[in-house]
């Protein structure tokens, strides 16, 4: 097969994910198609998939049908206005994470209005999603992110570079250690 019509690829993916019991079939198929075709939205999808795109879609649908989290299949996750990398072994952002980030951003904004500046510390930062959202959305806020484990810390470093959150101070340390908390 040299090219695969988009509507056929979409139907095939829907059937496979539905048969696997995936609940969010339409959203997952849309994300997998965008990922396989390197498209920024469904409106940028080609009318036909190349052989390479088709193979990538087949592989991704196969992994997702095995219940591998969509974000680990595609290697990306969306958080507020950010597109972050995702890897197995590091927590995936959830809707509740966005609510928490929103609260931190609002509180940092209130402190900035009162004092002129704020400091936010994100302990056990994982991918860095909360820290980067706060740094990019809350002006005059100093952000520190602490992560003990090597893989999440490496991911947070990559994500910081990816989203341009250079104001975030990343620290590889134990969040429960007194020296970390007092920054000595």
Task: Give short role names for the model-derived ranges.
Residues 8-12, 28, 56, 96-99, ...:
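Charged catalytic carboxylate motif
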């Amino acid at each position: 097969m040299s090219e695969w019509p988009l509507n056929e690829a979409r139907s095939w993916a829907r059937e496979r994910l539905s048969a696997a019991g995936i609940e969010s079939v339409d959203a997952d198929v849309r994300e997998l198609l965008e990922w396989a075709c390197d498209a920024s939205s469904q409106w940028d999808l080609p009318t036909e998939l190349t052989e390479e795109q088709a193979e990538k879609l087949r592989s991704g649908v196969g992994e997702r049908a095995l219940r591998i989290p969509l974000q680990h299949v595609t290697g990306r996750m969306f958080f507020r206005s950010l597109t972050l990398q995702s890897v197995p072994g590091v927590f995936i952002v959830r809707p509740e994470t966005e609510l928490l980030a929103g609260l931190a951003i609002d509180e940092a904004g209130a402190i900035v209005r009162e004092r002129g500046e704020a400091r936010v510390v994100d302990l056990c930062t994982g991918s860095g999603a909360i820290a980067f959202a706060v740094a990019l959305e809350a002006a005059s806020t100093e952000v520190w992110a602490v992560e003990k484990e090597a893989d999440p810390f490496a991911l947070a470093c990559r994500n910081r570079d990816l989203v341009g959150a250079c104001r975030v101070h990343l620290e590889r340390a134990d969040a429960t250690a007194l020296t970390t908390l007092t920054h000595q």
